[in-house]
Amino acid sequence: TWNAKEIWHSGKELHDSFPYMADDTGGGAIGWAADNRMVFASEQDGWQHLYSMSADGAGAAKLLTPGNCEVEQWSFASAAQTILYNSNCNDVDRRHLWSVSAGGDAPQQLSSGAGIEWSPAAVATTDSFVYLGSDALHAARPFVRRVADSRSTGQPFAGETWPEGFPTNRLVTPEQVVFKSADGFDIHGQLFLPKDLRPGEKRPGILFFHGGPMRQMLLGWHYMYYYSNSYAMNQYLASRGYVVLAANYRSGIGYGRAFREAPGRAGRGASEYQDVVAAGKYLQSRADINPARIGLWGGSYGGFLTALGLARNSDLFAAGVDLHGVHDWPTDNWDGKNISPELTKLAHDSSPVTAVDSWKSPVLFVHGDDDRNVYFAQTVDLVARLRARNVHIEQLIFPDEIHDFLLHRSWLKAYHAASDFFDRTLTVQPAP
């Protein structure tokens, strides 16, 4: 007893590394199933999947969830004989529920269609499980359904929670779009078209970039509160007449490890900026867009990309709203990391501050001054640089607020300020 025994080890390639999302799965990186089997997450085939094997080490690890798709959250059911999980298999820009035996029978898809489902959890002493679900027009609420019956549908056991007077009739269903970046990446996005858009009209367009960057915007209300808020804001902008595109740039999840870990990202070259430009050019190519009236917005990493777009391509982007963005990589929590001078220079060159001389478009900065994720000094420094160059800037600063705003009123004030800013800077003008 008390003797350790190796029953499996990962390979030596980069895709054999500990999977990025394993700590966020709900089931953890490893779990103990029935019949003395162990279940664990791995990206050894380039996608996050679940594997199982005998705890005594007999036999090879068995892939439970095959496909060019990713498992995100999982838990045990039926006395740990069954695994409930959600993934984007067969529907890359949503999440659906699946079940599979720990022994490795073929996976069974439990949900499909226009919904988004996540966080499945078995109900003790029953054959049912609960989960959270949403779709394009309905925010998250809890559902219950039976584990074994793939023909059944989840039944909500809580009502809608819209605030009184919420204009649900003004919500739109976003369309899935896919376009190419300059170096060949397929970039997925969700396109929100105003309900009152008429044939022949040219509307202003707005791009949204998520933070993280290991995130993915979906074709409906998001499972993370920050991005549920962002989805609501994109809906609000569409209701005000803008054509809105939420673009899932490289570095995000959902499209495999090679996409998430693409070379030259962030402070190593900002290669994902190619996806920002591609998104802008995609909007410009649309018949319903005024190509001279394209704005962009985002928070955190999305704020970084917003600032980079305005700094490098004010000819493409007419205005931007930057929420708590990184503006100079080496000055953002860089101390003590023992990074070489060469890489520090590369990080600086990959930052918005190095292109402020070509920044011409107006910008609104939103930041909490107690932000411990992206230091408030990032915004203070960039504002000073832009003022020295007579760039039109506006600021909304929240005293004592953190990165993910704590107060509901802070979110409302930020989003109303952003909408008002776009109304003033992207006023519809005759297209060239």
Where are the regions a protein language model picked out?
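Short beta-strand element of the alpha/beta-hydrolase
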Residues: L193, E201-G212
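Beta-propeller blade termini and top-face loops
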Residues: T25, D45-H49, D93-W98, R141, ...
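Non-catalytic accessory segments flanking enzyme active sites
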Residues: T1-P19, D23, G27-I30, A41, ...
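Residue-level signal for short, function-critical loop segments
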Residues: Q44, C89, K195, S300, ...
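Active-site-proximal cap/loop segments of hydrolase catalytic domains
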Residues: F208, H222-P432
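Structural recognition of the beta-propeller blade-terminating site
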Residues: T1, Y51-S54, S101, R146
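Serine-hydrolase catalytic-loop signature spanning alpha/beta hydrolases and amidase-signature enzymes
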Residues: P213-R215, V244
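Short coil/turn segments that connect the beta-strands within blades of beta-propeller domains
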Residues: D35-N36, A79-Q81, D127
